[in-house]
Amino acid sequence: MKMLLLLCLGLTLVCVHAEEASSTGRNFNVEKINGEWHTIILASDKREKIEDNGNFRLFLEQIHVLENSLVLKFHTVRDEECSELSMVADKTEKAGEYSVTYDGFNTFTIPKTDYDNFLMAHLINEKDGETFQLMGLYGREPDLSSDIKERFAQLCEEHGILRENIIDLSNANRCLQARE
């Protein structure tokens, strides 16, 4: 009986893991990321970019999937005022990679998502001969479990982003009142 329970637990873990996808993998279904999202955590190897009044402290509201692009709707806070910002990210030649011009040239991928709860994005910005990377954890709800947040922190470390450069925004003013 114990063996059967262990087998069931093992199969459950395999199934949960198998449901996750990466935009660079064959099993990624871009249509499933369509819809409403919330910025939960931002991380960067240039922390000032995501601190208060940083140009990349953007709060994702929605992803609208088109044939070869994504329309991204964000909010930003400047002097305690919320402003809406929309941008179009186009597919690049690389599988699962998108590009967008915003404060430089940006390319990004989605290294992990389960579609229903969370999405982890990895962005590289190039401007005036300098580059930095940014990672974002986004949720279908305004907050996520500590387990998912820890997995995101580990992914950031794998990309060379230190834990002190990870900012949990779940209690920050994310312009939730500005959502339609």
Swiss-Prot record:
One of its GO terms (biological process) is glucose homeostasis. It comes from Mus musculus (Mouse). Residues 1-18 form the signal peptide. There are about 15 group 1 MUP genes and their transcripts make up about 5% of male mouse liver RNA. Pfam families: Lipocalin (PF00061). InterPro entries: Calycin, Lipocalin, Lipocalin_CS, Lipocln_cytosolic_FA-bd_dom, Maj_urinary. It is found in: Secreted. Abundant in the urine of adult male mice but absent from that of females. The keyword Transport applies. Gene3D superfamilies: 2.40.128.20. The gene is Mup6. Keywords: Allergen, Disulfide bond, Pheromone-binding, Secreted, Signal, Transport. This is Major urinary protein 6. GO terms for molecular function: insulin receptor activity; odorant binding; pheromone binding; small molecule binding. Its main location: secreted. Disulfide bonds join C82-C175. One of its GO terms (cellular component) is cytosol. PROSITE patterns: LIPOCALIN. The keyword Kinase does not apply. Belongs to the calycin superfamily. Lipocalin family. Binds pheromones that are released from drying urine of males. These pheromones affect the sexual behavior of females.
